[in-house]
Structures are given as structure tokens and as C-alpha cells.
């Protein structure tokens, strides 16, 4: 053996015999507690926060030894027993001191209500926001806030219903019960239309120019009927080959045809279908749908009607405090244990050494809290707020892991928890709900030819914008008091002031071919929308002067969209095949899937920014679900064929979720955690499509980093927020119009050298090619389209910079190969001729976008992605 080989062998043996760090202590025993725990003298581990907290958590009391006397901070309230609690917890209706001194009448009666608050009476210690008085809800524990309120007086442009409710005068005698008691439709004269109007069979009036234009504007479609026009209306929609067209015009997936669930508005997908039968390995629900047989009686409602969990029997009959299970399998009554008679085949009910022995008398049975003596043996139990972690030791329960245990903020305490509210909200002590302080929140929703508003407290129901054509999408800039909506018939996005009594509205963005949804960025003052015809997601300034396609690939049926400018992310749903919900940076980077499983028709999505969750409606599964903003912690809120027959859009405020159902033509509300407390807010709608909450707390204020140091961030075209992935993420990036690339300075735009042909992502049956005109730097108008090809900047400086490093790496690799070849010649080897097959897969190109440190303004390096294949649906 050569000298080099012997040295290598000695080195190998030294490495093998070297002592390893296995976490052993000097005494050879493993440390039981980690860095976040305190080790008691008896070896037990407790959380470090429990040391010197005044409670003996170690059974030997070692956690309270050698403790420095604790003094409360200036921001704390000192309980009579010396305990410290935050000042804001004093007189909040919830005792936090162990002796209850923070809620003592002596302390709380001396309390003075703050500005914009009212007292609940001389005998009450409670203060509530002034805006909660006479809002229809008892917020004071004695109900004093709803006393002496008087009758609600409607304004001059409103009608007073028999119930006292106020509705818009435009709703009177319109053929719809808007009062919910029919009083707005009493004593109505036969409706007449003007000289330039057409009267539908339902008696409603539409402009004469809307008749026979192949777009049904009457709810009964009488303006496009064969009798009126002398021909059938021309349906312009052409469905992809993977979809079928309903009699009512819309497209649905082919696989939804004859599945027992009407998906078309007119139900034509379930006409002339063969009778359905379930396979032998399936269970047939009462509604006719089929589920796998293994899902029956599994404790989960898999059938929409819940019929799979009806008449289920518990196979384990040996449960409960009055039963004892023998080791031999029998189940006997607990009274037969230790009665000196054999009831179990194996005599396990009569163990000689265990009967009538109280193990709890010695060291509490080893239990850290409670020891319960049983007929045979014993069991440990814990005090409220704790749970067994090893059959003997009790640990704190983190109640904050339970969804909905607190309305907004949950603080886990030892043996309990504390609920708090976010800024701008105050807890209603009667319900535990964090209610908004300030103006009354309201729901605003589209009703095809108008936009309506209903107050959530006083239920005032009015018309905001009228004489519209076909409104399908809606959002608002609440701070600016502006509404934005998309009109399918006019292929445009409009805006209006919410307080405009004249009824003026303005066209902001044109050439929006089939808008599905819009989302307003209230911080950076842009608007995002999905287009179902061009299969794109676009962004534009609110005035419409600058716009571009943000995404134009891998979109099949883009639907709802929502933005969070505070974190720089945009979210959207796509009910194409496969259906999914995605998220990406609002600048078009860091695109990733959020929900891809158990999802079929995700129509509406909305963000709960307070709880950091995304909610969505699935019209096919008749389900309302939610996930956190990383796609984790998925929960089903509500599953209902009745209330979620064909849900279209939803919105969230406080502890309630509200949605529009197209089939029921109604607006519903429910608890956002449990799906309970279902309520109907509005009925008798006419093709309502979208809904939002209007309240200043829905759109929290944030900093517009594009206007922090220089106008528009120094960008020549669009300045868009970047996704805040970590502390080093840039705040914004510059973006160019379609057909232009960013220059190396990351701010200016230059035209691509090669002309680009643009066309929409389309099926082979589609004949029209959609194009749109966009304003580009220098005031040049170019015809742009859905696809975009980016050309990377040319240059060789980067290659010369890395050449020395490359040569060094090559030299090192060459030296290693020479050494291995020399070693191979000096070693005996054995060769096996068995072939080895490697599975290779073609991976998608992954591009890592470099980011610099925490500069406010920053741009991503240019990226080139060239696609030559059409994305056929």
C-alpha cells in the first residue's frame, strides 16, 4: 500500500472515530428541553414564558425559585394581587386579573368614555361608539343604546315602506318587491314607456335602440324575440372544443353535461339526458349524485344534501364512561368490573393487583394536574385550558388555532386566551364580534341595468347609478368616493362619483372585450381586470391613459380578481380546465398556484385582509371555502345546494360573508367562520353579477412608494407595486407597454426591434382576432394584442466578467479528474455489467429573478421568454 493510500485510510478512520455532537450533556444524558423551554429540577420541561410568572408549573416549584420581584410597566394595570395586565384590558368586560380587580365596579364606574363614545347608563360601566346608537342592534348590555330612537325618517327621494324601511323612489311600481312587504308595488298605474322607449312584456322600459341588437335587455328577452325582430338573435359566443354552449348563450365544460346538476342559466345542459345510475362501488345521494362508497358514514358530508351521513351507526359500541372493553374484545358494563365475577373471557375485568387500589394517593399518580382513580387503574386529567401531552403532563392549549374563536386578534395565554380587535374596530361585548367604528357599512351590487346600495344596519335600499346597459363587474376607490364598473355590452370600464346626484358617469377604459371582473388598487391608483375573450389579465391607470397585459398565457377562463396593494399581490380564479386559483406580484412577477385541488367552478374570490385569508365560491360544488394567503389551512365554510345554487360573487366585512346567487336572484349573508346565521338581504334581482362592501376600513391606507421620492417612481410608463416576499423585496418596479422592453436603467422603455404579431388565445373555432390600442412612451399609438414577446438586451460585458472565474473552476475540475484517474489505476475494482436506466423528464424553464437589498425603487432584470405555440383551449 502506498504512502498516500495509507494517509487516506488513516484520515477515514479518524473521521469515523471522531466524537459526534449528538446533543448529549457532559453527564452522557440527552438534554430533554429545547432552547424555548425551562427544565425543572425533576426533569420536566415547561415553556420558558412560565418561569417566574407567579404560578408553580413544575411540580417541585423550581420554576418560581430565585425570581426577581416583578414590577409592572407604565402601560400596565396593577391588579390587587400584584399581577400585571395591559391598561387597555381594564374595564373591557372581561376579567383578566386572577382576582378580577381590573373589572371592579369601583374602578370602572370612575371611567370616563372617550370622545365619540357614549355611556350605556349610570348603572353600567360600558362605553360604546356613538355610531352604534340606534343602529338596530343591542350593543349595551342593558339595551339602552336602542331606546328612544324614534321612527326612521326617509329622505325626499326615498319611499317609506309599510315596515318603515326606506327604498329609492325609483323602485316604486317597477314590478319588483323591493320593500319585501309589497308596499312599493301597491296602487300602481299601468306602466307606460316614453316615445323613444320599448316596453318589455314585464312592463319595464328600455331604450328603443337596444331592441333587436342581439343582446337581450328585457329580463324576459322580449326585445330580441322572433315576433319582435322577425329572426332569432345571433349568438356571437363560440365555445372552445372542450366546452358546450347553453341555450342561454354561455359556455360550460363538456363534462358537466348530464351530470345531474344544472349549470346553464336555462338548465339546458340537463335536458334530454339518459337516466343516471351509480356504479356498484358508489353511493347514490338523495339528489341523484354519486360519491365513492367509502365516503358513506365517514363523518363528513360528501353529498351536498348530507344523505351519506344519515342513519349511520357507530361501529364501536364500547364508548362512554359506563363501558369497559375487555382485552379479549367483549364490551361490558363498568359496574361488572372488580365484582369478583368473571365477565371477560380472559378475566381482564378482575385483575387481582389493580382492583380497589387508589393510585392517586401516591404522588398524585404522577399526574401534573388532576388524578382520577378508576375501578382498574387511574387516569390523568387537566384543568380548563390545558391538555395532556404525554398521558401525565399537562400543557397549555393554544386556543388561537381554532378558527373563529376570536373575531379578529387572538392572544394565547396560559390556560386561556384573549380576544382583541384591529384598529378601527371595537368589540361588541354582547356578541364578541369586532364591529367597525364610524359610518354605516353598506353593500353595493350590480343589477345589470343599475347599481344599488343597501345599508347593513338601517337597511336603507337605494339606487346609485341607473340607465346602464349590462353591468357585470364592480369595485370602488373608497377614499376617493368613486365607483368603477365594467359593461359587457359597451366593452368598456366606467366610473362615477358615489355622491353624484346628477347621474353622470365617464368612460375610463375602452376595448375591454369580455370583462369578467375588476379590482381597484386604492394605493397606487391602478385598476386590474380579467378578460374572458382575450384570456388575459390587464392593468391600467385609473384614468386609462396607460395600460398593458399583465398575463396572457396559461389562462383558460379567467374570472374573479382581487388585489392587496399593501403586500403587492394580485389573486384571480380560472374555471378553465384545470380550474385553479392563482396569485402573483402586482407587477407580473412571482406567479404561483394557490388552489388546484377539489375545485371546479371558482366564480368569485375576495380577500379578508384582517385575517389574511382568501374566500371563494365554487358554483359547481355549491361550496364556500377559504385558505390562508399561502394556499394552506383550507376550510369549508358552507356547502348548500339551496343557498349556493349558482353563486357568482362575494365580499367580506367584520364576521360576515355576503354573496350573490344568480339562480335565486338574491343576496345572502352568513358567518364567515361557520357558515351559520344565514340571512337573505335582497330578493328579486335581475341578473346581478358583482358585489362589494363600501366602508373605509375595507381599504386600509398604505404608502404609495411610486410617489415617495420621485413622480411615478421615475418610470417612463407604469409604476407597479412589487410583491413583498421578504424584507429585501423592492417596493415597486417599472413596466412598459406591450411590444416594449425596459432599458438597462430599469425605468425607460424601448421598442422591440422585431415587429410582433398579436392574437388572442383562441380555439380553432374562433374567427375573430382581438386587438387593442395602447398609449406608449412618446405618445405613439400602437396596435397591441394579447401575446407579448420580450427581447433581452444584448451585451458581452457580463460574459467577460465571469471568464476568469470560469477558467478557475475548469482548472479545479481538471485537477480533480487527474487525481481520480491516478487513484483508479492504483485500486483493485470489480465490474458489474448490469445496465442502469435513468428516467429523464423535461423540466420547465425556471428563471430566478435577482433582487437587490432594501432600496425603495428597484427593477427586475429583463427576462426573455419566447413562445411559438398557440395555447389551444
Swiss-Prot record:
Transmembrane segments: 798-819
Superkingdom of the organism of origin: Eukaryota
GO terms for biological process, alphabetical: cell surface receptor signaling pathway; cellular response to glucose starvation; cellular response to hypoxia; cellular response to insulin stimulus; cellular response to interleukin-1; cellular response to lipopolysaccharide; cerebral cortex development; cholesterol metabolic process
Tissues where this protein is expressed: Abundant in soleus, gastrocnemicus, heart muscle, placenta, brain, lung and white fat. Less in aorta, ovary, kidney, spleen, adrenal gland and thymus.
Record keywords: Cholesterol metabolism, Coated pit, Disulfide bond, EGF-like domain, Endocytosis, Glycoprotein, Isopeptide bond, Lipid metabolism, Lipid transport, Membrane, Receptor, Repeat, Signal, Steroid metabolism, Sterol metabolism, Transmembrane, Transmembrane helix, Transport, Ubl conjugation, VLDL
PROSITE patterns: ASX_HYDROXYL, EGF_2, EGF_3, EGF_CA, LDLRA_1, LDLRA_2, LDLRB
Signal peptide (residue range): 1-27
Region called Clustered O-linked oligosaccharides, residue ranges: 751-790
Extracellular topological intervals: 28-797
Modification after translation (UniProt): Ubiquitinated at Lys-839 by MYLIP leading to degradation.
Protein name: Very low-density lipoprotein receptor
GN (gene name): Vldlr
Amino acid at each position: 500500500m502506498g504512502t498516500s493510500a495509507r494517509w487516506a485510510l488513516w484520515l477515514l478512520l479518524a473521521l469515523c472515530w471522531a466524537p459526534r455532537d449528538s446533543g448529549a450533556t457532559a453527564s452522557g444524558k440527552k438534554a430533554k428541553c429545547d432552547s424555548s423551554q425551562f427544565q425543572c429540577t425533576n426533569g420536566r420541561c415547561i415553556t420558558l414564558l412560565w418561569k417566574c410568572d407567579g404560578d408553580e408549573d413544575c411540580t417541585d416549584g423550581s420554576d418560581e425559585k430565585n425570581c426577581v420581584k416583578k414590577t409592572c410597566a407604565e402601560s400596565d394595570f396593577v391588579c390587587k394581587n400584584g399581577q400585571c395586565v395591559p391598561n387597555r384590558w381594564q374595564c373591557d368586560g372581561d376579567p383578566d386579573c386572577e382576582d378580577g380587580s381590573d373589572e371592579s365596579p369601583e374602578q370602572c364606574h370612575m371611567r370616563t368614555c372617550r370622545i365619540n363614545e357614549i355611556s350605556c347608563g349610570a348603572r353600567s360601566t360600558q362605553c360604546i361608539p356613538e355610531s352604534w346608537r340606534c343602529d338596530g342592534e343591542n350593543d349595551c348590555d342593558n339595551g339602552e343604546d336602542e331606546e328612544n330612537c324614534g321612527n326612521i325618517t326617509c329622505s325626499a327621494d326615498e319611499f317609506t315602506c309599510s315596515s318603515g324601511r326606506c327604498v329609492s323612489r325609483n323602485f316604486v311600481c317597477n314590478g319588483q318587491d323591493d320593500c319585501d312587504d309589497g308596499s312599493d308595488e301597491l296602487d300602481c298605474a299601468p306602466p307606460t314607456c316614453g316615445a323613444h322607449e320599448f316596453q318589455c312584456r314585464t312592463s319595464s322600459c328600455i331604450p328603443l335602440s337596444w331592441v333587436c341588437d342581439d343582446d337581450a335587455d328585457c329580463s324576459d328577452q322580449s326585445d330580441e324575440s322572433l315576433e319582435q325582430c322577425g329572426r332569432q338573435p345571433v349568438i356571437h359566443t363560440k365555445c372552445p372544443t372542450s366546452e358546450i354552449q347553453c341555450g342561454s348563450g354561455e359556455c360550460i365544460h363538456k363534462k358537466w353535461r348530464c351530470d345531474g346538476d344544472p349549470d346553464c342559466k336555462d338548465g339546458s345542459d340537463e335536458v334530454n339526458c339518459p337516466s343516471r345510475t351509480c356504479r356498484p362501488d358508489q353511493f347514490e345521494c338523495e339528489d341523484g349524485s354519486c360519491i365513492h362508497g367509502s365516503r358513506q358514514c365517514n363523518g363528513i358530508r360528501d353529498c351536498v344534501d348530507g344523505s351519506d351521513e344519515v342513519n349511520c351507526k357507530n361501529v364501536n359500541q364500547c364508548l362512554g364512561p359506563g363501558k369497559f372493553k375487555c382485552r379479549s374484545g367483549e364490551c361490558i358494563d363498568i359496574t361488572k368490573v372488580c365484582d369478583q365475577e368473571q365477565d371477560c373471557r380472559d378475566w381482564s375485568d378482575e385483575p387481582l393487583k389493580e382492583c380497589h387500589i387508589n393510585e392517586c394517593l401516591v404522588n398524585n399518580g404522577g399526574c401534573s394536574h388532576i388524578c382520577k382513580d378508576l375501578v382498574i387503574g387511574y387516569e390523568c386529567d387537566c384543568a380548563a385550558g390545558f391538555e395532556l401531552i404525554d398521558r401525565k403532563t399537562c400543557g397549555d392549549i393554544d386556543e388561537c388555532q381554532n378558527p373563529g374563536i376570536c373575531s379578529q386578534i387572538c392572544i394565547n395565554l396560559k390556560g386561556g386566551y384573549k380576544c382583541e380587535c384591529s384598529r378601527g374596530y371595537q368589540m361588541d361585548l354582547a356578541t364578541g364580534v369586532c364591529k367597525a367604528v364610524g359610518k354605516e357599512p353598506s353593500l353595493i351590487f350590480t343589477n345589470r341595468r343599475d347599481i344599488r346600495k343597501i345599508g347593513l344596519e338601517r337597511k336603507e335600499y337605494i339606487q346609485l347609478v341607473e340607465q346602464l346597459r349590462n353591468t357585470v363587474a364592480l369595485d370602488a376607490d373608497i377614499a376617493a368616493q368613486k365607483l368603477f364598473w365594467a359593461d359587457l355590452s359597451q366593452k368598456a370600464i366606467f366610473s362615477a362619483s358615489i355622491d353624484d346626484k346628477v347621474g353622470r358617469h365617464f368612460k375610463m377604459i375602452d376595448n375591454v372585450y369580455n370583462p369578467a371582473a375588476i379590482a381597484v388598487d386604492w394605493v397606487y391608483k391602478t385598476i386590474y381586470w380579467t378578460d374572458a375573450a382575450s384570456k388575459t389579465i390587464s392593468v391600467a391607470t385609473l384614468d386609462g391613459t396607460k395600460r398593458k397585459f399583465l398575463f396572457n398565457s396559461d389562462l383558460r377562463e379567467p374570472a374573479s380578481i382581487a388585489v392587496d396593494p399593501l403586500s403587492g399581490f394580485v389573486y384571480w380564479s380560472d374555471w378553465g380546465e384545470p380550474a385553479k386559483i392563482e396569485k402573483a406580484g402586482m407587477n407580473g412577477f412571482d406567479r404561483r398556484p394557490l388552489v388546484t385541488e377539489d375545485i371546479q367552478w371558482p366564480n368569485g374570490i375576495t380577500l379578508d385582509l384582517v385575517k389574511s385569508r382568501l374566500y371563494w365560491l365554487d358554483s359547481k360544488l355549491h361550496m364556500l371555502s377559504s385558505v390562508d394567503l399561502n394556499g394552506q389551512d383550507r376550510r369549508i365554510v358552507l356547502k348548500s345546494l339551496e343557498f349556493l345554487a349558482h353563486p357568482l360573487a362575494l365580499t367580506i366585512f367584520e364576521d360576515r360573508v355576503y354573496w350573490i346567487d344568480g339562480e335565486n336572484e338574491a343576496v345572502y349573508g352568513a358567518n364567515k367562520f361557520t357558515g351559520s346565521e344565514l340571512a337573505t338581504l335582497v330578493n328579486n334581482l335581475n341578473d346581478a353579477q358583482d358585489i362589494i362592501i363600501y366602508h373605509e376600513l375595507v381599504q386600509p391606507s398604505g404608502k404609495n412608494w411610486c410617489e415617495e421620492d420621485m413622480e411615478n417612481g421615475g418610470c417612463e410608463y407604469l409604476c407597479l407595486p412589487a410583491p413583498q416576499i421578504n424584507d429585501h423585496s423592492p417596493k415597486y418596479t417599472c413596466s412598459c407597454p406591450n411590444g416594449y422592453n425596459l432599458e438597462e436603467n430599469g425605468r425607460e422603455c424601448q421598442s422591440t426591434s422585431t415587429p410582433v404579431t398579436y392574437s388572442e388565445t383562441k380555439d380553432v373555432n374562433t374567427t375573430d382576432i382581438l386587438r387593442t390600442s395602447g398609449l406608449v412612451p412618446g405618445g405613439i399609438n400602437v396596435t397591441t394584442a394579447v401575446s407579448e414577446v420580450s427581447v433581452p438586451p444584448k451585451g458581452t460585458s457580463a460574459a467577460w466578467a465571469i471568464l476568469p472565474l470560469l477558467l478557475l473552476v475548469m482548472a479545479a475540475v481538471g485537477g480533480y479528474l487527474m487525481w481520480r484517474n491516478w487513484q483508479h489505476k492504483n485500486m483493485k475494482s470489480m465490474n458489474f455489467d448490469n445496465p442502469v436506466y435513468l428516467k429523464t423528464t423535461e423540466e420547465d424553464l425556471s428563471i430566478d429573478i435577482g433582487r437587490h437589498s432594501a432600496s425603495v425603487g428597484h427593477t427586475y432584470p429583463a427576462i426573455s421568454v419566447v413562445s411559438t405555440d398557440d395555447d389551444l383551449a
